[in-house]
């Protein structure tokens, strides 16, 4: 009993984590982000369908040691939503991340990405390695691995059927905020997701796939360069969209160390399915 009371008193004595909103200008496109904490910069990039709030637990875990900035990707929530698939080209998505880092007065950051945020993070590291201190990827294989599996693995081709549907011109018309929030299991979070998706552009979400996802006939491709930056990959093995065989060979495409954490009971949204384990894995890896 005394231990429980002491724990409550200690928790009450700890300062609450303060979340602050901000906006960066990326060539005329307003990018919303939320920051917490002070220290080395950690930029966190969500995927589909999601928004900055997906990182809430990791932000609280990291804020005592780091300044964490979680981005709303263009098209989502409080960020601008330019029309036209050309405005969701990967080079512009990379520029958005750079704009946030520079807006916060930094030259580089630890970059964390999940799903589309992971795809952007890989490409950011390829094209702007000088701005990446470390790279953390959740449930998005190295581009070499994903393209190989799309070209050769019938199971991954079947698993990617949703992406082919998303690439069609009218795919956004079938989406609603409630449908997009269907994956959210936290009852307290679901209304926040529905509200955020109500502010988002469904067409913009689909433009990520129309502009950047590989199209049939699939071909194995090679990334523009090898990375010489430490990489942590965390992958929920119950992911039905991005299958784990795509992880094989990642170590052959990196010149720095790779740490791979697989979580058997987590699905695609590993940062929420296994929130504590993901947070502890990231903190432990960063504090090596």
PLM features per residue range, with description:
Residues 51-52, 119, 266-267:
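A short, glycine- and basic residue-enriched loop/turn
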Residues 1-41, 64-66, 107, 218, ...:
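Alpha/beta-hydrolase fold catalytic core
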Residues 17, 29-31, 69, 76-112, ...:
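Flexible "cap/lid" subdomain of the alpha/beta-hydrolase fold that forms the substrate-access gate
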Residues 35-80:
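Conserved HGGG/HGGXW glycine-rich cap/lid loop of the alpha/beta-hydrolase fold
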Residues 27, 39, 74, 264-266:
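Short, solvent-exposed coil/turn elements at secondary-structure transition points
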